[in-house]
Structures are given as structure tokens and as C-alpha cells.
Amino acid sequence: MKPLPWRWRLGAAALATLAVAGCILEEPILPLEELQDWPPINSAIPKDKAIEAKVDALLASMSLEEKVGQMTQVEIAEVTPDEIRQYHIGSVLNGGGSFPGQNKAATVNDWLALADSLWAASMDPSNPHQIPLIWGTDAVHGHNNVRGATMFPHNIGLGAARAPNLMKRIAEVTAREVAATGIDWAFAPTLAVVRDDRWGRTYEGFSENPEITAAYGGKIIEGLQGALAKDARPNERVVATAKHFIGDGGTDQGKDQGVTIVTEHELLNIHARGYFPALNAGAQTVMASFNSWQDKAAGEGAKAYKMHGNKYLLTDVLKTKMGFDGFIVSDWNGNGQLTTGNSNSPRNCSNSDCPEAINAGIDMVMVPYRDEWKAFIANTIASVRSGEIPQARIDDAVRRILRVKYRAGLFTKPKPSARLVNHEIGTEENRAVAREAVQKSLVLLKNNGNVLPLPRKAKILVAGKSADSLSNQNGGWSLSWQGTGNTNADFGGGTTLWGAVQKIAPNAVLDTSTTGALANNTFDAAIVVIGETPYAEGLGDIGKTKTLELAKLRPEDITLIDALKAKGVKKIVTVLYSGRPLYANKELNRSDAFVAAWLPGTEGDGIADVLFRTKAGKVNVDFNGKLSYSWPGAACQTPLNVGDAGYAPQFAYGYGLSYAQGGTVAALDETSADIGCGVTSGGGTADTPISFFDRGNADGWNMKVAAPSKWSGVVIAQASSASTSTPNGEITATPVDDKSGIQWSAIKAKWNNAEGQLYIQSAVEAETQNLQPYLNAGGALVFDARVSVAPTAPVKARIDCVYPCIGEIDVTTAIQALPVGNWTEVAIPLQCFADKGTDFTAINTPLLIYSSGQFELSVGNVRWEPNRAGNVPCDGASADPVTVLDAPRDVYVNGIADPALFDVPGSWSYGSGSIALNANFDDAGEKVVDVTYNGLKEGGGNGSIFFPVKSPNLFDVSAVAATGGVQFELRVLDYGGSTQPFWVKLVCARKPDTCRTGDLTTLVGRPALGVWTTVQLP
């Protein structure tokens, strides 16, 4: 092995320099050596002959039904003890925001009672075999789903602490609290190395640099698991999960569940580095990631494989080459995302039917919902009996699951409530560890004039929306999935920053206003607590139309700071809560001191410990934190990672001031970006979709319901299964899974035989946006729709420019034509609304659906797309015209056969070169399509021609799908210098990622020159 390239050694060099300057590291973060291949695992929990013999004996006597049951993981709200017995269920989980009895205030005893009942069902003597259930939970910053638990800083803050041994202690506390509630398994740690801070899960990663992730991975596994059943305190240990395997932090533009485009060498040396120490420490489970991997070395046209179906990485690499002998669990319905286009599956998967995921190496399948997990069990059994899933693959999966259960001591442990004498959580001792973690995670970006630390007797104004908010202080994955909908009381413990300050600063005053109502020139300083509000996966992504600029993402914060300064407050100390580095130059310039506090958890005392002096006026606790993520100096300076070419951040990786080593920050550039980081200027026309609701509200927009009892509207509660209604119940909205099966990512509206509307509106109702470029670009309003109950009254669609400025069309017929129970993409041309009066320069309501009577409609992924044809005409007459193909139909024979159904042939290419296409070339009196490929670089898929269906038509080919196909004739006149064969595929242009055959590379090959060759595409 040789040292890693300079871009990775730079981080270690920066750390070494800081250490010399006086920052004493708890344990050094060592540089990594470059790897050339996937290393073998030397697990701290090796195979045990006695356990293997027990597994062999049990496995040999199990039925297929029992085995598939062991491979099934279901949600606690979607299963009963009787079903555990009947279906031999091997595992349950509680999703974010799911509690015993769906009671957020559930006590430890409530959790234990449920754990006991589920465990007892699995161990019932009437079962053919008594195989203990294993319960998993997302304990990602402490036991964060449980009221009263200790919640630690999220991983982004822990990365700044640079304290590997502290990580082990944090994991030990987490394990004790998880075990105290009767749960056996923590879905942690997250080992993502985050490369684009727009990702909504950035805060779940310790660093952009794999060195920190590698230093932490093994320590956390040691703290959670210990030696499991062989540990000195086995009942205080839980099974750990290394997740999400692999590349989740590297997706293009930071898109959650997107595509990571890197070489295998980069995957190995960047994204995998945390896994090696974690697996060596004995991690017993690995969770597959939602993302896809596209091998950059294979070229731009290479297939992007979903990790849930990536046999090479899950089986060939992780299990075979590395020797991992625990089990791989899928993520929430991740198996259902496999298609022919993103895997080797011969068919598109569903949540309840996906042999490809199991064949690829998934051992336990997370299928949360009752109807789907029951169907999954039946379908999987059928697939084994048909030979689609080999029996040996099932046996391997179950062997791994049983092995882990034996290693964890689950076969010999008593019922969950009897395993520990003390079931306390959130103890003073545990919170002290979290308080220490907060102290060490804070990064001091600015301290001009040594404003900090503050004297305890100074007159201090504590202001900002987050000053007295445990919800904002904790962020996502806190009680609820997204961390939203929580009050301070819901946490059942913990201290806000204001709560901490008032303990030690007798002259401090809390101002909860947004305008600094209590501020005046008698205040020595203001502590202004600002930043992001809670979010988690998907909903936290910064989309293409947004930037990293804090002043635009959270304009209320800079407004408050300006108000405080205008009212004469002498010094401004800004404390930023955020799950990512942000471009905050405007806020930095207006602050005398600026602290990046990340998402510190429940123990706000840890912040006050560092901000204030002792009673004697001395430094109490110095700043320790150093940036584990580079800090941007421009609104769109992303991706930004240490070692990048032209690396020039505002504050570099490893930066962090202290009281011992201070410094002055000069005035910073405040340039804003006019367009989003993923948008290119279109000269008055948009060229990038704008999202208003995608698995949750986009920044600056709220989905609401309204009715006569409250026309001003009610914001829909999201990220849980709780419903939101208008006061008199005219319309009710409930989060449901979207078309991809992603939890609570769409909204189902139910009109209860009354007038009501579902709509998206600016968070500030009167605030408008100039979205004229989308109209100029021939755009459409697009959303996913699923009708559960067809409307009994007219349905209207509207786009408003602040009521009564509206444009409304009747879409009743189109909605009635949608298939009941199935998701359909609806697209309405924006011009329809412009024709009815919408002023697109002042939009505040980009979607409104109005009806009365009985009607149930689910809506998801609401956006405007430029250059998008509609499938609902402006008169709302119908949805896409569907043409049933039940007999042969000509597409192009001596020209386009039916111009009403088929459009003219087109071409596509990338890279150098071009394509010349003549769709009406005269070949001896007959029209043919003549194509010349000019100078295209070598490599598959660099240029293509296509024959499109004319928008807005759709074809129903189900009648001929089994036996039919597409036939065409091809004559090659000259191959030129190309050595590549022809490839062919079928693609649904509107859904290219989910509806395509994939590249068929051998069907055409290289036909002989000068003769017509017939090709049949099944």
C-alpha cells in the first residue's frame, strides 16, 4: 500500500498543524493509506463452532414458510402478536415517529410491554420453533425516538469534536438506553462520507473526509455491541448496523437516493473507509443504501445500479471478498425501487415482490406495511418454489440471521423487561456525556474583539426562533422522522440554550419576537440563535432552484439581527443551528462572534458552558471543535471538499478558533446568486424544474387544506401518519407513501361531502415569486396523483397570483378518467392557467385543487417542468389518450404512418461529434430515415436516434406484451472508424429511469454492410 493522494493527506496535515498550535486531540485522527482492493475483514466477533452447529441444526428443521418469515421485517404498527406467530416474523422495527400505541408520550414501560408481547409471540411454545424476534430502531443520535431519552449532537457535530474515544462512550450510553426499552438492535452508525452539502442527510455524516469516519466507525461499534452475548454486560449491548452501504453521501448534486457517479477506486477509498474498521470491530448487520452507483470508469452511458440490487457489491465484494458473515438488511421498501433500468431484474419490482433484491444479497427485507409484507411472504415463497430464488440463497440469508441472533444471546435472554434491573433513560450520568459532546462539537468561526466568553453578570438578550426550541436544537430524527411537530414538553427532558443561560446569567432576558421587540441599547450583548428548522432525508435536500445562502433560506434570521443592531444592542453573538455548512457571510458580517453549533441535541447547557465565563471571570470551557466540513464562501460553492482542485473555501477543513488561539475575521463578500445552484441561466426561460412538494414541503412553501370553516387554511402536518382537518372536518389530509413506497411522502386529501381545497402556498401568504420563465418555457404543472374515491362533484385546478388573482380550469373529466388505486403522472400546461388569468410574475399558490362532495385524492412530487407537454388539455376533458395496441401497427413505412400517434424521428448525442438525420430520405422512390454519425467519441451509447410517440398519447401494450415486440429494418452503408456494435432499447420518455428495457447490447450487433437486416425487439 502507498499513502493516499495529496487530497486526502491534506486533512491530516491540517490537523497536525492545529495540534502543534495547542489543540490537544483526544486521540489522533490518522491519515489513511490508499487501498487498491477491498480488504478482508478480521472481525472481533469471529465464527463460533458451537453457534454454527446450532444454526445448522435449526436451519435443517425449518420449513420454507419459517425461513421467509425470518427474512421479513415489519413495522410495529402493522403487526399483531398473533401475526408474529402465524407468519413466523423474524424482525420488527419502529419507523421514525412510530411509538407503542402510536403515542408519542409512551413511557419506557409502554415500550417494554410491547417488546414483551412481540417477543412472547415469537417464543410461543405452539410455534414449530421458538426463534426470538429482533427489534430494530433508528437510534442515530441517542435513543431519539423515545420521550425522555438522551439525545446527542448529530454526527456532523461529533465529527467536529474529533474525539474517537468519546464516540465509544456515546455509543455505550445509546446502547444502554435502547436496551432499557427492550429493543435489541440500533440502526447505527451512519458511515456516509458526504461530498455535496445540499444533501438533506448531510448532518448524518461525520465528515467530508473519510479519515474521521474511519476513526469513528470501529469505536461506535465497540460501544454499541461490545462482545454481545460474551460481553461483561451483555444486557446493556445491542446489535449495531453499518449503514448505508454504499455511496449514499456521494450522490450527484446531493440528491437523496440519487446516483453516485464515481470509480470503484473512489468508492473504495472515499465512501467505504468507515466500513472497514466498523466490520473489523464486529458489526453484525449492514443496511443497504437507497442510492445507485454508476461506475465512472465505465463511461457516461454506464448503467446506474441501485444498491438494493447490486449483487457485485453486496455479495461478491462485501460477503465473499471481504468475508462479512452477518446479515444485510434492506432500507424502508428499498427493494421495491428496483427496475429493469436500475438493476438486473427481468421485471420491475414492487414492495411486495422482488426476487432480484434477495438474489443480489439482501438477507432481511424491510417491508413495513401489513398488506405488503403479507404479499411479500407469499410472493417470495412462490419465487423459491418456481426456482426464481434459489433455495440455497434463502438458506444463506436465514443462516446469517440466526447466527446474529445467537451471537446477540437472544435465544437465551429472558423477555425484554426482565433483562435489566434498571430501565432508566435520560439519567444525569448519560446527559453529562451528551453535554460534554456538545462542548467539544462547537466551532468558533469568528470572535472579533474577544467578545466571547461573556461575563455572567452582563445584560444579555437571548433571541431568535431557536433560542428556546428543543425541536430546532435537535433537528431531524428526533421523536418524529423529520423532527417536526414537537414541542419542548414532548421531549420529556433536556435543556434549551435559553434554559441553560437563565441558570447562570441572572441579567439575561428572552425575546421570542421576530423583530427584537425587547431590544435596546442597554443590552451588552445579544445571543441570537438562528438557522435551519428540522428536516430529514429527502425533505432536507436543497434542490436545484435553491442555494446554500442562509439569508435566502431563512430570511427571518438576518432580519432579526439587523433589527437588534438597529436598536443599539452593543454586541451580536450568533449561534447557528444547522445540519450543514451554509453560506452565511451576511450574518457573519453582522455578528461580532459566530458559533457553528450544528444540531447539538437535548443538552443546551453544553453551549452555555462554552459561551460564558466562570463566576470568577475565567474561561470556563474553551472551544474545541474544528470543521469536519469545508465552509462555503459563495452561495453555490458546492461540492466543496478538502483536496479539490482550486479548493478555496471561506473557512477550510480543520478551521476553528479558540480562546487560547483567537483571530480576527475581516469583512466578507456578500454576493448572492441570482439563480439556484442547479440552474443555468435561460435568458428569460426556465430550463430546470422547480419543486414545491417532494416528499414534503419545499423551502418557502406549505401544503394546506381549507374550507368554509377556515378559508385561511390549515398547514398539513407531515412526517407522521397524523391527519390534519379543517375545523368542521370538511376536508382531511393524511401523509401516505408516495408512488415509490417512500414513507409519508405524499398527501391524501379526503373531501367529506363538503366544499374544500388542497393547495400549496407561499409560507408567507402574500409573498410572491416571479415564475414567468416557466410559462415562457412552455412549462406544465406536474404532479403524481392517485384517486382512491372518484369525485362526485366538479374538480377545479387553479394557480393563484394572490387571490382574487387566479387562473382556474375544470379538470373533472380528466380526474374521473384516472385509474382508481394507481399512481398516474398528471401534467397541465401552464398556458391553460395563463389563459384564465394567472399572472405568472406574482405566484403565491402554484397548485390548488378544489372540489365538494365525496372525493379522495393523493398527491405527490408537485413541480413545474419547463418544456413539458401536458396530458390534460386546457378544457380538462381527459387525461392522456390511451391507445390500446392489440394488433400490429405501422410506425414508419414510407414516412410516418400515423402523424396523429407518432412524431418525427429525433436524435440525441453527448460529447464531441454530431448526428445528421434526414427523416424523409428518398431511397429509390421510398422514404427511409437516413442517419450519419459524425465524429462521436468511442464508447457505448454516445449517439442515438429514436421514434417517439406523439405527446400526449400513451400506448397500452399489455395485450401484446407477452408475445409482441417492435420490428424494424436496418441497412449499414459505412461503419467508418467505429468498432462499437449497435445498441437498442425501449424507453418511456416521461419516466426514463423507471420505464425502460435497458441497453440491449447484443440484439443488433454489427450487421453486414449494404443489406437490409430485420431486427425484432421483444
Model region roles, listed by residue range:
Residues 1, 66, 569-570, 917-919, ...:
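Generic cytosolic/nucleocytoplasmic N-terminal low-complexity/intrinsically disordered segments
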Residues 2-11:
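Bacterial N-terminal signal peptides that target proteins for export
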Residues 678-1018:
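Beta-rich carbohydrate-recognition modules and glycan-binding surfaces
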